[in-house]
């Protein structure tokens, strides 16, 4: 057995504590760059990104609202959050394939239940409108998952009117 074989470890893409901790650095960066932020909206697939961001923000500024967004056709964490139980969907369908997750993370579910204020869903048409709006207004090309926070803001899914709000526009690589 080689030295590399001894140290091989499969790292879960979203349900790993170190992955979530690393993604929490985004929350720290938000607080550093916009100290008076009032709300942060984050896309959700399995929940790793929002878990880290929410934990970091709520640890330092518990009054800041942290919201999650999922595609309506792949709303596994939305369902778990609102039903107050961890569960798996039978089917997911969305062009926002990066967040098309049937089973959310167990560790992420625990953190989200504790630190996230609410989770909403957006339709495929709302995601498409957000993608086009980002292109037209910001000259930014985002894939479907990354545009879900903007869709939630554009279509008034959350109580953020008049609040200093950050939409985390992320995506697959």
Residue ranges and their predicted role:
Residues 1-173:
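PLP-dependent amino-acid enzyme catalytic core
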């Amino acid at each position: 057995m080689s030295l590399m074989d001894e140290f091989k470890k499969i790292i879960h893409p979203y349900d790993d504590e170190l992955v979530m901790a690393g993604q929490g650095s985004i929350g720290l960066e938000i607080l550093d760059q916009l100290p008076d932020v009032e709300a942060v909206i984050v896309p959700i697939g399995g929940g790793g990104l929002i878990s880290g961001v929410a934990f970091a923000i709520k640890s330092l500024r518990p009054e800041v609202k942290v919201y999650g967004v999922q595609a309506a056709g792949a709303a596994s964490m939305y369902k778990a959050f609102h039903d107050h139980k961890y569960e798996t969907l039978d089917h997911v369908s969305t062009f926002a394939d990066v967040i098309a997750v049937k089973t959310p993370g167990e560790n992420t579910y625990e953190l989200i239940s504790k630190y996230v204020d609410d989770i909403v869903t957006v339709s495929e048409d709302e995601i498409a409108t957000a993608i086009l709006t980002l292109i037209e207004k910001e000259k930014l090309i985002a894939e479907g998952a990354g545009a879900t926070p903007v869709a939630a803001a554009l279509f008034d899914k959350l109580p953020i009117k008049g609040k200093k709000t950050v939409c985390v526009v992320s995506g697959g690589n």
